[in-house]
């Protein structure tokens, strides 16, 4: 709880554990852990309110509020959201001081333009986009819509016994206030309570309810406007955010002021109040984060989808005050764009009629995307960091942070299969994240005595509804128009040599994926490889010295070899001798450590391969 208070007051999030971060991310409430305009505005409002309470001039109050905002920004090293809020507040207060009409959207656009003049590259920065679009959503859609929906109801409920207020209200509001008083007054006599107590008991909850509706409307507006940039940058939609903000909004009003005051005064009771409220916030966020179906992940939208979504939000902002049917039409258009972004009803970035193999750049690990000829996709291994000599898994989830985003950018929503060649962490650590997000129809594993490392993977597969297929040496089956053959040396002594080897046949070309086999495994492969001519070889064991022997290369005659290895890794992969062997046989080499993601594809007759540095074609 203390770490949450530090994050919410000073932007210091290093004390937060990974579980807490994950809960706030899943609930859509992570923004409260990053000091933003909400915190700056609250702090400035407290300063202005304090000056006014002392009876000092309004000009001094405004100047103090702006000074507090800029001082807070300097304290936090002028982080973008804080600086944005400080300058927006200064512009807004300046307009008030010179008696100019204050337009929040004008202030937002003016400050954004000034920031871009200072640093044009910020236009592509996710933080810049989310920061300004969020406040634009509040000012342009959320606040006006909440005002239009809830203001008449709040006018009815506010100070219900004060008949003098009726003179300044619309007729329809007055009629409802009179009817409510006519109902409450006899009720107070029946129950024997004063009218104010009856109002507090019956009208008070209604006021709270309409305040909650306002928070929901504003949160929904932010969710709507941020859908496109969130899906594009993070491939995630925070559907739970409007509900999480019901707890965030009131608790932030307690935590931030109490935390600031505790920092300034050192008062222990204030710090205890802030940590108690932070504990309640953490409980609420944890509960919301467990709601099934509200943590939605989607491939990034295309340029036209983003443009249409943002344009529909602009139309909605303009239509709110135009009339009911215009507002409904604009809202329907914005909702339709949101649904398109969420469902992403587009084919993945895979060419039908081609077999593709892409080595994803996962550092010193391996994750291979296999694009099948029918337009579906599979994955062989899921990356991870080597953990040799350690029982502790890496805190950085390669599957969640690298593999899944790459597959998402390719427009893939579900995998036909996930194959794990063996249980080393650099091949399977990311598999659980891939299973959770892409729910493969099948999980392929070598039919050998399973090690304990496979058990969490099997449990995750069962939870995802994934069929588990154990493959033995010689198993052959079709994956659409592609034939798949498995080779496994079940009697080999080395752990790596028992890797699942897969051969994908399409037309005239064969792709050989060798896992981490070394000398013993290669000998078994050479003895059991029917039709040994190979077009594409995924070099065994990241190109280690004891792999990719001259015998294997002489037998297979590959055209292209892909090496999956980390840049300047500790193991010296790929070994210089392996690169020399490949060069002597005129094999084109693609390396993830130098070229990034490397792709080879075939239409059954012609090979194409590409990486960051070059694109080649071969008809052999």
Residue positions per predicted region:
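Hydrophobic alpha-helical transmembrane segments
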Residues: 42, 60-67, 82, 86, ...
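Hydrophobic alpha-helical segments of integral membrane proteins
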Residues: 1-4, 12, 20, 28-29, ...
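Aromatic-rich juxtamembrane segments at the membrane interface
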Residues: 1-86, 93, 200-203, 358, ...
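Membrane-interface helix caps and helix-loop-helix hairpins in membrane proteins
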Residues: 73-83, 97-102, 118-128, 228-239
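Membrane-interfacial alpha-helical segments at the cytosolic side of multi-pass membrane proteins
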Residues: 37-56, 87-95, 135-146, 258-262, ...
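Alpha-helical transmembrane segments of multipass membrane proteins
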Residues: 49-50, 67-74, 90-97, 113-121, ...
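Membrane-helix interface "capping/anchor" motifs
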Residues: 51-61, 95-107, 144-145, 320-326
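Non-globular, low-confidence helical/coil segments that flank catalytic cores
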Residues: 122, 154-203, 207, 263-620
């Amino acid at each position: 709880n203390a770490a949450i208070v530090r994050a919410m007051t000073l932007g210091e999030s290093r004390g937060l554990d990974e579980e807490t971060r994950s809960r706030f991310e899943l609930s859509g409430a992570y923004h409260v852990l990053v000091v933003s305009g909400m915190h700056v505005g609250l702090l400035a409002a407290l300063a202005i309110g304090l000056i006014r309470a002392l009876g000092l001039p309004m000009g001094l109050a405004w100047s103090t509020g702006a000074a507090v905002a800029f001082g807070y920004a300097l304290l936090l090293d002028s982080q973008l959201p804080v600086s944005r809020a400080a300058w927006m507040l200064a512009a807004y207060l300046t307009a008030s001081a010179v008696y100019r009409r204050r337009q929040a959207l004008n202030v937002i656009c003016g400050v954004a333009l000034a920031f871009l003049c200072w640093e044009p590259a910020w236009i592509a920065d996710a933080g810049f986009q989310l920061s300004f679009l969020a406040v634009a959503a509040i000012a342009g859609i959320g606040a006006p819509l909440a005002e239009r929906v809830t203001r008449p109801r709040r006018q009815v409920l506010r100070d219900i016994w004060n008949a003098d207020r009726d003179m300044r209200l619309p007729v329809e509001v007055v009629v409802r206030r009179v009817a409510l008083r006519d109902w409450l007054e006899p009720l107070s006599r029946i129950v024997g309570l004063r009218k104010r107590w009856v109002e507090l008991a019956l009208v008070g909850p209604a006021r709270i309810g309409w305040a909650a509706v306002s928070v929901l409307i504003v949160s929904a507006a932010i969710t709507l406007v941020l859908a496109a940039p969130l899906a594009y940058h993070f491939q995630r939609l925070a559907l739970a955010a409007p509900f999480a903000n019901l707890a965030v909004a009131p608790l932030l009003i307690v935590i931030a002021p109490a935390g600031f005051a505790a920092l300034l005064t050192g008062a222990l009771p204030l710090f205890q109040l802030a940590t108690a409220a932070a504990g309640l916030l953490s409980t609420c966020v944890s509960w919301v984060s467990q709601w099934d179906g509200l943590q939605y992940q989607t491939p990034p939208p295309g340029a036209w989808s983003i443009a249409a979504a943002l344009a529909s939000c602009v139309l909605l902002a303009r239509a709110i005050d135009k009339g009911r049917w215009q507002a409904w039409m604009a809202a329907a258009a914005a909702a339709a764009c949101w649904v398109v972004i969420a469902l992403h009803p587009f084919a993945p970035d895979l060419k039908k009629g081609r077999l593709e193999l892409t080595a994803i750049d996962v550092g010193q690990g391996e994750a291979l995307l296999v694009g099948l000829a029918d337009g579906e996709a599979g994955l062989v291994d899921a990356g991870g960091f080597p953990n040799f000599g350690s029982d502790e898994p890496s805190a950085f989830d390669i599957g969640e942070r690298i593999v899944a985003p790459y597959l998402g950018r390719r427009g893939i929503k579900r995998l036909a299969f996930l194959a794990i060649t063996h249980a080393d962490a650099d091949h399977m650590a990311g598999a659980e994240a891939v299973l959770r997000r892409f729910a493969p129809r099948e999980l392929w594993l070598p039919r050998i005595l399973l090690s304990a490392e496979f058990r969490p993977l099997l449990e995750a597969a069962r939870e995802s509804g994934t069929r588990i297929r154990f493959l033995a040496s010689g198993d052959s089956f079709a994956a659409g128009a592609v034939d798949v053959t498995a080779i496994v040396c079940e009697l080999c002594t080395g752990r790596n040599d028992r890797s699942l080897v897969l051969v994908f046949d399409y037309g005239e070309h064969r792709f050989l994926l060798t896992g981490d086999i070394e000398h013993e495994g290669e000998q078994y492969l050479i003895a059991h490889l029917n039709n040994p001519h190979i077009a594409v070889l995924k070099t065994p064991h990241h190109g280690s010295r004891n792999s990719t022997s001259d015998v294997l290369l002489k037998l297979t005659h590959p055209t292209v070899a892909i090496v999956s290895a980390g840049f300047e890794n500790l193991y010296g992969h790929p070994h210089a001798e392996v690169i020399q062997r490949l060069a002597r046989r005129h094999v084109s080499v693609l390396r993830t450590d130098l070229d990034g993601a490397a792709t080879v594809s075939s239409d059954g007759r012609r090979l194409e391969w590409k990486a960051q540095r070059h694109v080649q074609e071969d008809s052999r």
